[in-house]
Amino acid sequence: MKVPFNWLKDYVDIDMTAEELGDALTLSGSKVEEVVTAGAEIENIVTCQIDKIEQHPDAEKLKICQVNIGSEMIQIVTAADNMKEHDKVPVALHGAILADGSKIKKGKLRGEVSNGMFCSEEELGIADGKEVIGLMILPEDAPIGVCIKEYLGLNKQVLDFEITSNRPDCLSVLGMARETAATTRKTYRMPNTKFEVKCDKNINDEIKVTVNDKLCNRYMARGVKNVKVAPSPTWMQERLLDAGVRPINNIVDITNFVMLELGQPMHAFDRRELKSSNIVVERAKDGDKFVTLDEIERELNSDVLCIKDGEEIVALAGIMGGLNSGVKDDTTEIVFESANFDGTNIRVNSKNLGLRTESSSRFEKDIDPNLAALALDRACALVEELGCGEIMEGTIDVYNNVKEEKTLEVSVSWINKFLGTSLEAEEMKKCLDSLDLKTTINGDTLEILVPTFRIDVDIREDVAEEVARIYGYNNIPATLISTSTEKEAKDKKQLLDEKVIDTMLASGLNQSISYSFVSPKVFDKICVPEDSSLRNVVKIKNPLGEDYSVMRTSTLPSMMESLARNYSRSNEIVRLFEIGKTYIPNSDENELPTERNILTIGIYGQCDYFDLKGIVENLLDSLGLKSASFKRMSENPSYHPGKTAELILGRTSLGVLGEIHPDVNENYGVDVPCYVAELDLDAMYNFSKTEKYYKPLPKYPAITRDIALLVDDAVLVQEIEDAIRKAGGQVVEKVELFDVYKGAQIPEGKKSIAYAIAYRDPSKTLKDKDINKVHDKILRALEYKLGAQLREQ
């Protein structure tokens, strides 16, 4: 869960950096996976207004836009279709850098000049993994010509927490504020929930709620009259964007804001769209159809809990509202829903419907039903603060099985014995009180009142854990234990080294071993520039000779020597690998050099770049690094500028692979193309996930469709595959490249790329109409993102 650092500081006085807080929270049991700075990479992207839109004369799906960027008018050619004249959108100008590192240049699209590119949330790095089709449309009052990072408040730090299933109370900013306050020995502030009722009408006179199923633990509602739907204020939009949620309008934003802040999902119904005064919570009937807010019609069964208006379904309980009752621009009266539903039922239905939302992800973890009242009060307070409506009198509250606080009694001496500590009862009380576990000391006994939101505190061991983590595991003294000496197990590096070796051998490679000392002249042979940092080497005081006088900073010369030696002995097909170290000197000569563990792969004879890439992909698979990607690079002087790639995982470079530069081949006396990969094993091991998980064989068949695409030469295979998978979603099981063609019938500067795409749904047999819908979506995404055209057969 992503928690903006600035939002956290609204509730706790924090006197440390986000990184320091992340470390402290991780030590106290709230694991922070990473601290990210949203939008830090993007450059030269500004807000603009589209003044005029015309059809491209030579391309049906392209439009020519005249754009005001404040300082001048420019022309942008786009394939997007969700904008209109006078809309304000982000535009990446010539030289701009997108969130993924892509650079934007001025160019021509089908003969028309385009001075940049309009941007979506994805290009800005704020889509948060959600699928985005179309441009990001900014509010009408957005200024023109302002840096988008300044306007959206990017460059802000966000803490990404790993929340376990037994801590639903931490699925909110307030929950993490409570943990932060306890960890830093501070107090936290509750958000404002006070408001004034200004409408004399009572919701209980207008709405009746009936709950016909025990799957609904609690259902609360409150009415708002004289609603004014408008964009949210900037501060609220910034909070939502920082947390990865797109602002929509003030009413919807309030429900999303409360969900993120307190952890309680909410929904707002347009009162005029409710067909009667009766709201009924009950199960759907088998075969019922319902169109959700994402404009998709879904077929329901009798397991799905629904909210009905007496005549028809208006929401899927705990999952998503309906298109028929959502808040619109002209909505004037709403009903706020704050409810609590059975977590198991929500989880099953969410999975069966293929609809996992922020709401369902919280309900499925069994959030506290008593949170519903607090959230409803908070939403009404925000309505008053934003001046977007008048709160009606009365509250509807159907709460049949009230959940109450429980009491635990635990011995102080038992906790000390269990933890190996000698803490005073008062110290334990401070730790527990800071977590809202209200504690009373009665002699050697702690009497703890456990709030309903702490479903994980149930036995005395749970209490001891809370004391230990807030007191600080690092503050508990270490003690020696008596034990027998056993053979030391292999560490992670040794086990991974063995896995790498096994993978290389299984790929048909032979292991080679070379000296770590080399000649300074090898850098000339691999065409390293004179000012390169690779020439900054550790010198050996008593070398065996000139050829072994320095420690290597690159393993490429060693591999090229091995390949050249084999070539000189007429070995026509060679497949080698080596695991060795490089030695990078530190600025302080008295310090030891930095050693990096490098895997070098070298092949030649009856092979090409894709053979080398396949070997590397096998390695990535064995190390659990499937999310790594290949990015074209041309600045490495030792490699062929058009046939070289950088291996990247996130923002970390894992190495380089490609064809060796012809000049380097000539320097080593090799007349055939050589392909080499230099991979940083230390970096790969940091990300390695080698655990195996059971996955049952698929019950339903896969269906394969072939597509042949016409794309620019500069478009990478990786970009195409990424676009296919992102647009296709979970039903795309496999994307396999089977043909790359240039030649007759292919325009100059273009290439034909052919893929076989396998579609499979784990929950049902896909029909042609299902596949056609996804297939068409993929083609649209490829055209929009990469300018790809379906090649005519």
Swiss-Prot record:
Any one GO molecular function term: tRNA binding
Primary location group: cytoplasm
Annotated FDX-ACB domain residues: 698-791
Subcellular location(s) per record: Cytoplasm
Obligatory cofactor(s): Mg(2+)
Record-listed E.C. numbers: 6.1.1.20
The family this protein is said to belong to: Belongs to the phenylalanyl-tRNA synthetase beta subunit family. Type 1 subfamily.
HAMAP family per record: Phe_tRNA_synth_beta1
Stated name of the protein: Phenylalanine--tRNA ligase beta subunit
Record organism: Clostridium perfringens (strain 13 / Type A)
Species classification: Bacteria, Bacillati, Bacillota, Clostridia, Eubacteriales
